[in-house]
Amino acid sequence: MDIRNKIELFSDGACKGNPGLGGWGVLIKNSKNLNELKGTQQQTTNNRMELIAVIEGLKSIQENSHIEITTDSMYVKNGINQWIDNWKNNGWKTAAKKPVKNKDLWQELDDLVQNYSIKWVWVKGHSGHPGNERADQLANEAIAEFYDKNNTLNI
């Protein structure tokens, strides 16, 4: 892939309580631009925030792009690369015959990834990786901004 056309997407999710108030953050960069996205959801989980971060990031990128997605979530990376085909073949049930959690988001992500050429990269969270650290900051900023806007305390 031509380095000038490379798009890097760094995603992260955070949750204050699990479930609780969640935030997601995305850093997208190529050779010319840098874009940051963030958002929140109430009464959610860290895994939902991890999935939503990737989904929202992909939605902001032109289809047919070549993207390197870096996440610290093995749940997201393994889910989309190893588990999802079995889930679909088993009627959205796990190997233990239980319903797949976050099915709605997995289905949305599965539809989205068909429109891109994606390389998935896992990094250890809070290990100093600049893109991952910034995505983490964005997710936590989103939560802090929600608390500020709604005059609530982060307890």
Language-model-detected regions and their locations in the chain:
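RNase H-like nuclease fold core
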Residues: M1-I52, E56-H66, Q137-D148, T152-I155
